[in-house]
Amino acid sequence: MLGDGNEGISTIPGFNQIQFEGFCRFIDQGLTEELYKFPKIEDTDQEIEFQLFVETYQLVEPLIKERDAVYESLTYSSELYVSAGLIWKNSRDMQEQTIFIGNIPLMNSLGTSIVNGIYRIVINQILQSPGIYYRSELDHNGISVYTGTIISDWGGRSELEIDRKARIWARVSRKQKISILVLSSAMGLNLREILENVCYPEIFLSFLNDKERKKIGSKENSILEFYQQFACVGGDPVFSESLCKELQKKFFQQRCELGRIGRRNMNRKLNLDIPQNNTFLLPRDILAAADHLIGLKFGMGALDDMNHLKNKRIRSVADLLQDQFGLALVRLENVVRGTICGAIRHKLIPTPQNLVTSPPLTTTYESFFGLHPLSQVLDRTNPLTQIVHGRKLSYLGPGGLTGRTASFRIRDIHPSHYGRICPIDTSEGINVGLIGSLSIHARIGHWGSLESPFYEISERSTGVRMLYLSPGSDEYYMVAAGNSLALNRDIQEEQVVPARYRQEFLTIAWEQVHLRSIFPFQYFSIGASLIPFIEHNDANRALMSSNMQRQAVPLSRSEKCIVGTGLERQAALDSGALAIAEREGRIVYTNTDKILLAGNGDILSIPLVIYQRSNKNTCMHQKLRVPRGKCIKKGQILADGAATVGGELALGKNVLVAYMPWEGYNSEDAVLISERLVYEDIYTSFHIRKYEIHTHVTSQGPEKVTNEIPHLEAHLLRNLDKKGIVMLGSWVETGDILVGKLTPQVVKESSYAPEDRLLRAILGIQVSTSKETCLKLPIGGRGRVIDVRWIQKRGGSSYNPETIRVYISQKREIKVGDKVAGRHGNKGIISKILPRQDMPYLQDGRSVDMVFNPLGVPSRMNVGQIFECSLGLAGSLLDRHYRIAPFDERYEQEASRKLVFSELYEASKQTANPWVFEPEYPGKSRIFDGRTGNPFEQPVIIGKPYILKLIHQVDDKIHGRSSGHYALVTQQPLRGRAKQGGQRVGEMEVWALEGFGVAHILQEMLTYKSDHIRARQEVLGTTIIGGTIPNPEDAPESFRLLVRELRSLALELNHFLVSEKNFQINRKEA
C-alpha cells in the first residue's frame, strides 16, 4: 500500500506509461541482474579465467533515427558494451577490454519497438502467481478431498493431498504419488526432524508402518524410492551420484524454484520467516504446507480462490526482456567456453574481444520480437488502436492458458478486477475473457500485482490522501462507489452510500466508509471510457463498441464528436499522432513536411508525417494548426494527426440520422444513406497500399530492372521511367507494370527461334534469354503512386537482395457493402445509397443522411444511442459540445433524460423551431417522405449521433473466381480471397437449391465447378466453341477419395453409373 505525494489531486496517468516504465525497469535493473549472474569461465586446465565487470556496462545511442529505421527496414537498437577481463592464473596477469556483446532493441516513448522496420509491441501476460494454493474437490463417493498445489516460478506443479485416513501424499507427476515422509526424507530431513517441525506429529506417526520406516531409514533409500516413483523406473535402481544429479536437475531445480514472488507468497500463506533471497522450496515449506492441509481437513483455515487477482501476477515487458537477456547470456557463455578450449587446443593467445561474439544476443532478441506470441505487430488502424494495443492483458502465451481449454470461470469477471481490469473491454470469439484491457488508473506494482488508486477518508484530517492498493489489500476496507467528481463534494456527504466490502456490494452509512473511488472512469479501459451514456447500454453492446472504435478508419475530413466523455484529448495526446512543441518559441517557417521553431538562441526542426502508410493500409498524415510567426508555449499542439481535430480524437462524423423503417432497405441491421455522404466526401478515406519486389543474383546472373520488356504492350509500360520503375504521381490501373524486371534463364538449343540460331552460327552472337518477372498491379489496386523506395542491399551479399517498394494511394468513398457503426454497438452494412431528394426530410427542409432500423434498439438494450442522438441534435443547433461522465444517475434520478430534454427545449427556443422539442412526443419529430412530400404516420426520433466508418470495406472483401488453384487431395478449389479460392457450397446451401428443384445447377456445383477433373477441363473447351456442356461420365474426385478411405478400413465399396439412354448399368471401379 503506497501513498501519493499529491494531496487530493488526481490526474490521469499517461496511457503508454506501463509499457515505457517496464522497459526502463529492464534497462535499470534487469540488465545488471542478469549480467551479475554471468559466471566466471575457466578452461579445462584451469589456467585462464574469463569474467565480466558489470559495473562499467554502457548502452550507446543509436546511429540512426526512428524514421530511417522504418524506411530502410532496420532495427532501432542500442549497442551494449561491457568490460571483460582474461586472467592468467599462473602469472596473475590480467587483460581487460571493453567488448561489444550485441544489440538491444530500444523502445520509443509510445511503448513500441522497431524491429526490421516494423513497429512491434510486447503485451503483458497474466499468470498464476507462484506459491501454494488449497482447494477442495468431491471424489466418486461424494467426500471432500483437500489438495494443496505448489506452483513453481516457471509454472511446474506439484500437489499435496490428504485422503480419508488423514494420510498425506505428494503427487510429483500425474500418475505416481509418494508419502510426504519419503519426500521430506529425500530433501534431507530424518524422522526426528520431521516430527519436531510439524504441528500434528501424531497424524504423521499414524501412517508410519514398517514399510515406510524402511523407505525413510536412510537418505539413500528415500532418494531411491523418490527417484523410482518420480521417473517411473522399474526394477531396483542403485544409488549413485549421477542419479542424484538427475533428480536435482529434473525435479528440484525445475519444480522447486519459487522465485522472489513465490517465496513472498509462501511466507505469507504459511506464516514462515524464510529469507527472501532463498527462492527454492525447502523441507520447512513442505511440512508447513502439510500442517495447513491437515488444518483444512479438520475445518480450520479457508480455501483459495484461484481466479482472484491476488493469486495472479503480471509478466510485464521488463520480465520478458530480462528472460530473453538471460537466455542470450547462457548462449554466450557456451560460445566463450568453446572458444577458450579451442584457443588453448590450437595454442593461440585469446583476448576478450576474440572470445565474445554479438550474434547470440542480437539473434535472441530478433527471434523473440519476431516469433514470441506476446510480441505482436502494432495495430495502427487509428490513434486509439495504438494506445489500446499496448494496454492489453493476455492469459494466453507460454506458461499461460489456451483458448480451447480455458474454462468459463477463468473467463468470467471477478470482483477483484474492480478498478484494475476493465469488465467491458475484451475480445470476441474464442479468446473472450482471456484477453482483457487495463483500467485507466491501474498500474503494475513491485511484486507483479495490479494496483488501483483510492482516496482515504480520515476523520482526523480534512484533506484526502491517495493510496494505491494491491488486489488483496482493498478487501479489508469499506470502499464507497462515489468518486471525487461528485457535484456535492463540498457539501455534507449522503447519509447512505453504496460500498464494496470483501467482494460483496453493500449499502452502508457514510461514517463507516474507509476509501472511495477517485474517478468515474476508474473501472473502465480507454475504449469503454470513450462511450457516452455507457450506463444505459447492455454490457455486450458496450464490448462491441469498444472493439469497433479500434476499427474506425481515419477520414479525409475529420470532425470532433458533439457528445463525448472528456477523454478524447488525453487519448489523442498519448497516441503520438499529434506534433507537440517540446519547448516555447516562435514559428519562423512552415511547410507541409516540417516546422522550424526558434527559441533559446537556436532553431529546432520538427518533421511532420506526410502520407505515411500504417500496417492496416490506412493513411497517417499530419496537418498544420499554427501559422508562421506565432509564439507558442511548451506542450502546445502544432499539427493534428490522422483522426484528430484540435488535439482531440475524431474517429467519425456527426450525421443526421432517423430511426425508421424505409421500404425494407434497413432490415436486419442494414443502413440506408444519402448520396450527400458520397458527393461531399463526408465518409471518404485514403488508403495506402505497399507493393514490393526483390532483385536476386541467380545462378545465371543478376536480375535486371529495366523499362525494355519484350512481348508486353506499350500502354502497360507507359508509367515507367528510364530505370524501369514507375514514376511518382502516375495514375495506375489494374495490370499496369510498376517495376520492369527480367530474370535470366537457361534455354535449350531447340527452343531458340531459327533466326537466333543463324546469328549464333554465323556471327557467334550470344542471344540473351530472359523471363519477364515484372511487378504488376493486382486487381483492385488502382490509384496514385505517392512514393517509390529503392533499398540497396547491405554488405554486397546475394542473400540480402535489393528491394523496390511502390506505395499507391487510393481514395475510397463510402459505398454499398461498407460497414458503419455508432459508439453503442449499433453496427450495420450500407444497403442502398438514395438520391438526397428521395431521403426523408425534416420540417426545416434538411434531408436525413442515414436511416437506421428502430428494431435494433429495444432487443439489444443499447439505449445510450438514443440519448446521444437527441443530445447531438441539440448540440448542433446550439453550436455546443458536451463532455459527459458516465453514471450520472448517482447525482440525480433520471439525470441523463433531464439533461437531454432540457437541451432540446433550449435549442427549440433559441432556433424558434418548435418541432425540435414537442412535449407530446419529446425527442421525436414529424418528418416527410422525400418521394411524395407527405408526412409519415408516426413521429420519428431524429438526431446527430457520431457514426464511424470501419475498416471492413467491400473493396477488400469482394471476390470472384473463374478458375484457380485446387487442393491436391480432394481436388476442390482452395478457400479464401488470398488464395484465389472458390465459394463454398455447404450442406445448407445444397438444401436450399434442392428446395427449388434446380437439378442442373446442383450438378454443376458438385461436379464441373468443384472436383470433377475431366469434366471441368471439357467445360472450358465447350464454353469457348459455344457447344453444350457434356454430362460427367465418372465419379467426382471427393467420392473417389471417400472410397479409398473406406478401403483403408477394409470396406470395399463399388459404384455404378446408369446410362440415360437405355438405362444400362455400367460397373465402374473407383
Swiss-Prot record:
Biological process annotations from GO: DNA-templated transcription
SUPFAM superfamilies, per the entry: beta and beta-prime subunits of DNA dependent RNA-polymerase
InterPro entries in the record: DNA-dir_RNA_pol_bsu_ext_1_sf, DNA-dir_RNA_pol_su2, DNA-dir_RNAP_su2_dom, DNA-dir_RNAP_su2_hyb_sf, RNA_pol_bsu_bac, RNA_pol_bsu_CS, RNA_pol_Rpb2_2, RNA_pol_Rpb2_2_sf
MF annotations from Gene Ontology: DNA binding; DNA-directed RNA polymerase activity; ribonucleoside binding
Location(s), subcellular: Plastid, Chloroplast
UniProt keyword annotations, A-Z: Chloroplast, DNA-directed RNA polymerase, Nucleotidyltransferase, Plastid, Transcription, Transferase
Catalytic activity: RNA(n) + a ribonucleoside 5'-triphosphate = RNA(n+1) + diphosphate
Primary localisation category: plastid
GO cellular component, one term: mitochondrion
PROSITE patterns: RNA_POL_BETA
Disulfide bond is among the record's keywords: no
EC number: 2.7.7.6
Reported function: DNA-dependent RNA polymerase catalyzes the transcription of DNA into RNA using the four ribonucleoside triphosphates as substrates.
Complex and partners: In plastids the minimal PEP RNA polymerase catalytic core is composed of four subunits: alpha, beta, beta', and beta''. When a (nuclear-encoded) sigma factor is associated with the core the holoenzyme is formed, which can initiate transcription.
Similarity comment: family membership: Belongs to the RNA polymerase beta chain family.
Designated name of the protein: DNA-directed RNA polymerase subunit beta
Lineage: Eukaryota, Viridiplantae, Streptophyta, Embryophyta, Tracheophyta
Gene name of the record: rpoB
